[in-house]
């Protein structure tokens, strides 16, 4: 009886770990914090509070 309970617990643990590993991989792929940040290179026109900021700073309407 004890062996059956231990076997069921072992199988349940393995299945739970496998599912957790699978879902953690998809979370990393979909996470916006992990994605590479985009920025405008120097010389591109800019303005304060742009959706995609300059890689450096915005000086006189151009990325520096």
UniProtKB/Swiss-Prot annotation:
Compartments reported by the entry: Secreted
Q: Name one GO molecular function term.
A: ion channel regulator activity
Q: In which tissues is it expressed?
A: Expressed by the venom gland.
Signal peptide range in chain numbering: 1-20
Instruction: Name the GO cellular-component terms.
Output: extracellular region
Q: Which residues form the propeptide?
A: 21-38
Q: Can you name this protein?
A: U6-theraphotoxin-Cg1a
Q: From which source organism is this entry?
A: Chilobrachys guangxiensis
**Lineage of the native species?**
Eukaryota, Metazoa, Ecdysozoa, Arthropoda, Chelicerata
